[in-house]
Amino acid sequence: MNKPKFIFSIAAFLFVCLLSLTTSFAQTPVRQQSESSYEVLLQVLIASNTTADKSTAVPQTLSSVVTKLRTNYSFSNYRLTSTYLQRIANRGNLEFKGVSNEPNQDIYAPIFSEFTLGQLTNSPDSNGQNSISIQNFRFGRRVPIKTADYKDDSGKSNAVVNYESVGLAMQKLNLSLNTPTIIGNLSTSKTDELMFIVLTIKPIK
């Protein structure tokens, strides 16, 4: 009478062990995915018809971006003016605020830049390839606008500067990994220029 009970107990024990192992293996990819980290590279390109400075030359990694822009816009020159490198985890959020690192700007009236990136998630696309989805993205700048001039007590001429906010915001972006992607464009204070925002997401191994 005890033998069937013993066999049943052994079978039940083995079943529980097998179930635990199956659950553990099933959860491993999810855990690995949730712990993945990524580099967020945001770059600002300025398109114009003026001669580009060699110090702001577009790197080879953005050559495909410039080629695509040339097919849609008639600007003769493109230059890289700002680069921001941040780090984020899968399903994470990112917020950056700071003084722009754009060259040749007025040190007494700098440009302030900020961008936010919410709910970055690694998920397969329609072809089964890993891609990045972003729930919301915003890029903004506070740019100085000269509104008037005045002279101080010494007779020196000074500018009156007010700051205006410009930017773009969007929801539900999809990007391929390791691929520079044009997010959008903004006008600048110059009528013959256009600013392009380029975003690249790279996995950190």
Residue locations for each model-derived region?
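Sec/Tat signal peptide C-region and signal peptidase I cleavage site
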Residues: T22-A26
